[in-house]
Swiss-Prot record:
Protein name: Mycobacterial beta-ketoacyl-[acyl-carrier-protein] synthase III
Protein family according to the UniProt entry: Belongs to the thiolase-like superfamily. FabH family.
Free-text note on domains in this protein's UniProt record: The last Arg residue of the ACP-binding site is essential for the weak association between ACP/AcpP and FabH.
Catalytic center residues: C122, H258, N289
GO biological process, one term: fatty acid biosynthetic process
Length: 335
C-alpha cells in the first residue's frame, strides 16, 4: 500500500516576540457613569477597572490587529515575508465574510500565506496559540503570527449598568517559531456549552432581521455566574497546564490570566499557590476587558514596564464565552 507522506517540525518552539496596539481614546468610569447609576468607586471595587480604551469609528478589528502584528514582526527581527501563517482570535470582526485573518495578512504584506480566524471568546488567544504551536511542531508552518483583536465597545449597551463598564478595545499578538529550548507547554482547553447563556449576544441576527425596527443585539453578561465559574474552576485548569508542562507552582514567575476581573485573578493566584513574589498581571485597571486580546496585551504590558523579563516562566489562562477556556505555560519573549 502506498504510504502518504507526513511533515514534522521542531520539538522546541516558543514566543519570538510580542506586539500590541491600544486605541488612543481612554474612557474613565466617571464618563460611563453619565449614562448609568453607578460610580467610579463602585466599578473599581468590583472589577479593578479605572479606565479602558475605545477604538475610533474608523478603527476595526483588522486594522488594530495589523498594527499589533506589524510590531510583533518587527520585534522578532523578521519581515512579513518570513511569516508562514496568520491566525486572528476575535469575536468582533463585523463581517460575516471574508474573515479578518486574510485582510490582516494582506495589510502586513504576508502574501499568499494561510490566514484564518478563531472565535472562542475570551479564551480565543489561548486557542489560537495552541493551534499555532501544533502547526509549527507539525511542520506545516515555520513562523506563525498569532493575534487577538477585539472592538467590543460597539457591542455593549451603554445603559446596562451591569456590564457597560467592563468591555473595551485593543489588539496584541506574538510570533511563534523554533527556539533553542522549549518555550510553549501543552495546551489544556475545553468548554461547557451548558452555560452558554452566561455570556451571549441577546438577540440573534435572524430574529433581528424579522424585526429590524426592534431592539438591536447587544452583548450580555451574567456576572455572578461567570465569576463563580472562573474563580473556582479555572484554578484546576491552571494546575492541569502546569502539570502538562512539568512545572511546579513555585516555579511560575508571572501569572497572565484573562483580564476579566481583578478579584477573580486574585482568587485564582491564591488557589494556584503561586510564589508571593510572582507577578500577577493587572492590565485590566487601565485597559478593561479586551476578550481575546487581553492576555497578549497584559504580556506586552508586564514586559514594557519591567515587571517581567524575557525568559520568565508564565502561566496563561484564558476563559470566557462558550463557556470556553485554554491554558498554557510559556517562556516570555523579549519585550
Amino acid at each position: 500500500m502506498k504510504q502518504i507522506s507526513a511533515t514534522s517540525g521542531p520539538t522546541n518552539i516558543g514566543l519570538l516576540s510580542v506586539g500590541s496596539y491600544r486605541p488612543q481614546r481612554a474612557v474613565t468610569n466617571d464618563e460611563l457613569c453619565q449614562n448609568i447609576d453607578s460610580s467610579d468607586e463602585w466599578i473599581y471595587s468590583r472589577t479593578g477597572i479605572k479606565t479602558r480604551r475605545f477604538a475610533a469609528r474608523d478603527e476595526s478589528t483588522a486594522s488594530m490587529a495589523t498594527e499589533a502584528g506589524r510590531e510583533a514582526i518587527a520585534k522578532a527581527g523578521l519581515e512579513a515575508s518570513d511569516i508562514d501563517c496568520v491566525v486572528v482570535a476575535t469575536s468582533t470582526h463585523f463581517l460575516q465574510t471574508p474573515a479578518c485573518g486574510p485582510a490582516v495578512a494582506a495589510a502586513l504584506g504576508a502574501t499568499g500565506v494561510p490566514a484564518f480566524d478563531i472565535s472562542a471568546g475570551c479564551a480565543g488567544f489561548g486557542y489560537a496559540l495552541g493551534v499555532a504551536a501544533d502547526m509549527v511542531r507539525g511542520g506545516t508552518a515555520g513562523k506563525v503570527l498569532v493575534l487577538g483583536s477585539e472592538k467590543l465597545s460597539p457591542t455593549v449597551d451603554m445603559t446596562d449598568r451591569s456590564n457597560c463598564f467592563i468591555f473595551a478595545d485593543g489588539a496584541a499578538g506574538v510570533v511563534v517559531g523554533e527556539t533553542p529550548t522549549q518555550g510553549i507547554g501543552p495546551t489544556v482547553w475545553g468548554s461547557d456549552g451548558t452555560q452558554a447563556t452566561a455570556i451571549r449576544q441577546d438577540i440573534d441576527w435572524m430574529d433581528y432581521l424579522d424585526r429590524p425596527t426592534g431592539p438591536r443585539p447587544f452583548l450580555r453578561l451574567e456576572g455572578s455566574a461567570v465569576f463563580r465559574w472562573a474563580a473556582f474552576e479555572m484554578g484546576k485548569v491552571g494546575q492541569q497546564a502546569m502539570d502538562a508542562a512539568g512545572v511546579r507552582p513555585d516555579e511560575i514567575d508571572v501569572f497572565l490570566p484573562h483580564q476579566a476581573n481583578s478579584r477573580i485573578n486574585e482568587i485564582l493566584a491564591k488557589s494556584l499557590e503561586l510564589r508571593p513574589d510572582a507577578v500577577i498581571a493587572n492590565d485590566i485597571e487601565h485597559t478593561g476587558n479586551t476578550s481575546a486580546a487581553s492576555i497578549p496585551l497584559a504580556m506586552a504590558e508586564v514586559l514594557a514596564t519591567g515587571a517581567a523579563k524575557a525568559g520568565d516562566l508564565a502561566l496563561l489562562i484564558g476563559y470566557g464565552a462558550g463557556l470556553s477556556y485554554a491554558a498554557q505555560v510559556v517562556r516570555l519573549p523579549p519585550g
